[in-house]
Every structure is written in C-alpha cells, then in structure tokens.
Amino acid sequence: MAKVVQLPIIVTHNVKVVEHENVSYVRTRDIADALGVKQPFEFTSDIRETLGGQVVLNGEDTKDFRSGTDNARTPYVKVSDMIKFLEQGVINHRTNGTRKDVIAVLQSYMNTY
C-alpha cells in the first residue's frame, strides 16, 4: 500500500505599491498573480465593469509613477479601489482562495500608510 502525504505549500507574492502624490497604487497584474487569476486582462476588465472604467489607470495617467519595466498600457488601480473591488467578491470563482488574505494585507498597508 502506497503512503500519500499532503504537504501545505505556501507561496509568497510580493506586490509593489507605488506612492504618488499621497495616493497608493498597485498594478492589476500583480494582484491577479497573487490571487492565482489566470487571465490578468480579464481581471482588469472585471474591475472596470464593477467599479467603472475611470478607476483603472494607464497611459498618460501613470507616466509620472510607473516603473521602468512598465509601459503605457500597464494598468494601475488605487489600493483603496482594489480593496473595494475585492471585498465585493466578484472574482471568487476564479482565484486560489487567497482573496481575504490579499484584502487583509492591503488594508494593513493602508492602515500603516
């Protein structure tokens, strides 16, 4: 008889937060990766549909704070808007189950900021 053992593997995702003019932003792709979302563009589309297109920034709106690895098409969202979106649970069915953990980390960051 074969012995089967389940090992809990915890993966850490580092999400870069950009501070610009006293506002905190995250890349939607980074949050999608942390949540295990396979289609980050669909994730960004969900944010637009849920909170409105104006909350997703790119192009001229991000030129003053995006990093050298980003381009004008890289979408950013305010951390506060990302928390709002995640709290609505719109994407529960497509995540790795870490939505509440991601919310907690973002809220903790905002409380210390």
PLM segments and residue spans:
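Short, basic alpha-helical nucleic acid-contact segments in DNA-binding proteins
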Residues: 49-63
